[in-house]
Amino acid sequence: AMLLTHAQTALAGSEESRFKKPLKTITRDAGYPAAPAFSKSPYSDIITKYAKSYGVPVDLAHAVVRVESNFNPKARGSAGEVGLMQIKPATARAMGYRGKTKGLYDPETNIRYGMKYLSKAHELGGGETCGTILRYNAGHGAKRMNPISKRYCGKVIAMIGN
């Protein structure tokens, strides 16, 4: 058996308390910016305007744009998704867009139609975050969570906290 001196026991105790304290400050959004960081986006006014106009929670709207494009209006996805909200041209047309694909790179146009789609996803998801993300990411008709949408929802929850 190992015998510890009083000094070693005291040291072990102080080591333990030293490591316990920082853990209390770590939150599940570690590694993601807090919601106020969204206000630094050059598109936050447009995002907020359309989120409010379509009844989408503003923090959710900002989180979706961040996950989709990291606020890059020139982003292009591998399946033809375009712009800030990575909307497919066919999806934008289903939401009433009548222009050319390149018009969807315009931040306001992209957010207008992307937010309209997100609003419907939010409604279909019953206002629940992961239900909304599933339907935005996998299509309005999606019913079962998939690994990609689950990861996406995890990122959004880490950013907005619910």
How would you describe each model-predicted region?
Residues 10-31:
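N-terminal propeptides/low-complexity segments immediately following signal peptides
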Residues 102-109:
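A short, structured beta-strand-centered segment in the mid-to-C-terminal lobe
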Residues 2-10:
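C-terminal segment of classical bacterial N-terminal signal peptides
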Residues 45-52, 62, 93, 112-119, ...:
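Solvent-exposed, polar/charged alpha-helical surfaces in well-ordered, non-transmembrane soluble domains
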Residues 132-162:
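Catalytic and substrate-binding regions of cell-wall glycan-acting enzymes that process beta-1,4-linked
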Residues 7, 26-71:
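Export/targeting segments at the very N-terminus of extracytoplasmic proteins
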Residues 79-98, 114, 156:
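Substrate-binding/active-site groove segments that recognize
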Residues 69-72, 91-94, 139-143:
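Solvent-exposed loop/turn segments at secondary-structure junctions
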